[in-house]
Amino acid sequence: MMASLSCVEDKMKTSCLVNGGGTITTTTSQSTLLEEMKLLKDQSGTRKPVINSELWHACAGPLVCLPQVGSLVYYFSQGHSEQVAVSTRRSATTQVPNYPNLPSQLMCQVHNVTLHADKDSDEIYAQMSLQPVHSERDVFPVPDFGMLRGSKHPTEFFCKTLTASDTSTHGGFSVPRRAAEKLFPPLDYSAQPPTQELVVRDLHENTWTFRHIYRGQPKRHLLTTGWSLFVGSKRLRAGDSVLFIRDEKSQLMVGVRRANRQQTALPSSVLSADSMHIGVLAAAAHATANRTPFLIFYNPRACPAEFVIPLAKYRKAICGSQLSVGMRFGMMFETEDSGKRRYMGTIVGISDLDPLRWPGSKWRNLQVEWDEPGCNDKPTRVSPWDIETPESLFIFPSLTSGLKRQLHPSYFAGETEWGSLIKRPLIRVPDSANGIMPYASFPSMASEQLMKMMMRPHNNQNVPSFMSEMQQNIVMGNGGLLGDMKMQQPLMMNQKSEMVQPQNKLTVNPSASNTSGQEQNLSQSMSAPAKPENSTLSGCSSGRVQHGLEQSMEQASQVTTSTVCNEEKVNQLLQKPGASSPVQADQCLDITHQIYQPQSDPINGFSFLETDELTSQVSSFQSLAGSYKQPFILSSQDSSAVVLPDSTNSPLFHDVWDTQLNGLKFDQFSPLMQQDLYASQNICMSNSTTSNILDPPLSNTVLDDFCAIKDTDFQNHPSGCLVGNNNTSFAQDVQSQITSASFADSQAFSRQDFPDNSGGTGTSSSNVDFDDCSLRQNSKGSSWQKIATPRVRTYTKVQKTGSVGRSIDVTSFKDYEELKSAIECMFGLEGLLTHPQSSGWKLVYVDYESDVLLVGDDPWEEFVGCVRCIRILSPTEVQQMSEEGMKLLNSAGINDLKTSVS
């Protein structure tokens, strides 16, 4: 290690050199930074061959991620000292002086990252050149000298811990069948026995030849000839691990990992532990004072934790969540087969690890306890950036989280700009070093208003205020939704057979039918005088309803009625100056004109789209735009009802959220096919004498006010099913969709099941496999329905944080009330689950598709048939997923988003 850098050190006039687990070189010469970097590159390129990045990362482990060259990081001297302590097996003593001018975390820019591997032991390590900076503005433009750009983990590999027979001189190496079939070339099983020669390379580009044979009773894959030579040359013993990978060039490579063994005696040439600790601190302090680059060596297998943290990761952990005692968290650990597994725990304390030397340091300032009893090898202190909090796991769901099968690219004949936009999440935590959003959300999707809505703690009364705020933005034209639509919204299709011309007005006969009577009431109510600010929105909303209902000629009466309502309302606004301002009337007239007059907008990239593709995308786009409006008032002689707009049935939300579209081809996205899929867009009215509000009570999970109706077939409900308390399934479907979207998916992290606190492994899978067999097409073919397939089981487990899980038989209860009462008695929560609105406690369950839903949302028979486990959430757990972690976005991210929207 030292010999390879001697020439560089002479030319750079090195003033400080420390060997061991943490080697640091501080440069004090007057040569420029570019010359030093060129020297480093020349020396590393001439002295050593280039290390294969994928094999290096496979040996390092799945959790290791090196920073990119040119990025900003935080360097923690405490973590570097821990690496020195592990290599010397001696911690720092009181003889190590304190450096008050050295901060606990030092902001640096990464100038170089070089991968290394020891020739004798194959121990891997990385050399990093760090430049201290005062702030993000001091970033130096780093040229590309072919240095490491980012971490490359292999996609195809397997890792096995060697047994005694694997390291014997006559046994050979047993390869798992799946690994052999996946990585090795196919065997000729017609030969007796099937054999082949494998040529693999290691980290040092050495070539090894193994004989791969399929034999034994039972038969298994073995590496025989050449394996003993490999074991002897690498000095492998039982407990060490061997990895086989295929890199991006499809080359077969092999690597080794040494098991941690106690070292009997340290070599006499190694410096004392105190000297090495002093060298780490002194070199870092000197580089900080003089703003000169310094070198560090990072050993991922020996180091307890990473001490070079990317700036974005640090800010996301420190500023993106408010950690508190009692908070639940998850943390990833490496498994024996080089996989990843999440362990769950609880924060029991927040304090400085070393208050004397490093007061206020974030390094391992969290005291934790693990759920599982066999976690003695897990650390009792962790850093905030090492854990995953509930808000980081669940609060940023992807817009496509409802899709259980991705649409095949061939359905779209090439991805368009709109297709790429709907695949992006609406909100993402900034990954850039300066905290700027990587891209702005699409303005016409009302991202600003959506962000504001999501920043607030949930309250059902926030929905009218949110709608009023959007209405004000629309009327005033402050870069609101309608203003953006004028500039960016693609217009309606040019298919006359599917268009309702404004000249085609239909006179509704009041005595024709009940449906016609309802349509007449709708027309009369929309023509009735209203408040000034609501008049404008009603006209615009009617235009959106007209577009949303324009699915086929079979619904021509409803569509034409809505068209008449829209035109009459616009005429009323133009004839009554007292009811609205000219600006309001002009906006409504423009929007109405946009619906009937197709135009082209090359800005959004729709000029070269096919007619059918444009039809589908425009229909979804305009329906989404109509989903952010205040509920308009429908009044009749005996009743008045506030009905939600057509957001509940907007085609875009079905296109994006609804799993029922996964098996459809692209040509089925036309309005005529949407009629078959979404027949629920028939808006019915109730003639009851009471005043009803179509605003079902929603849970206080995030995204309650921004969702689509899922698995709803309104054809099975009579007239009046959409109003007030007459539609219980409406609220249930909204509740189920919201809960599933809020809990099931995350853009930044993987999905996970709830941990098993009652014993067993308690594993939390990082990847959830979904069952696609639940989608069936009915005999008529007019709609898609999700059929709950009953699963054979005996008991259902009920889990609660901090308590031992219980098992119950849900079939022994008659309804939800009995179930909740029994669970309350089991866990001593009398009255908390039966009155969730006042207590704040939530009872959720996981179905056989791994969707997390609220208990009570679905019919009892369906719940009994699909429940897999039940989970009790305390008010703290519920609030953490909806409120915490948003303060940073509310203060910093929203400003950037406002600028991009306006």
Swiss-Prot record:
The keyword Oxidoreductase does not apply. Residues 497-543 are annotated as: Disordered. GO terms for cellular component: nucleus. Residues 158-260 bind DNA. Signal peptide: none annotated. PROSITE patterns: B3 (PS50863), PB1 (PS51745). Residues 793-877 form the PB1 domain. Interactions between auxin response factors (ARFs) and Aux/IAA proteins occur through their C-terminal dimerization domains III and IV. Absence of the protein probably causes early embryonic lethality. Premature stop codons are associated with vascular defects. Auxin response factors (ARFs) are transcriptional factors that bind specifically to the DNA sequence 5'-TGTCTC-3' found in the auxin-responsive promoter elements (AuxREs). Seems to act as transcriptional activator. Formation of heterodimers with Aux/IAA proteins may alter their ability to modulate early auxin response genes expression. Mediates embryo axis formation and vascular tissues differentiation. Functionally redundant with ARF7. May be necessary to counteract AMP1 activity. This is Auxin response factor 5. It comes from Arabidopsis thaliana. The gene is ARF5.
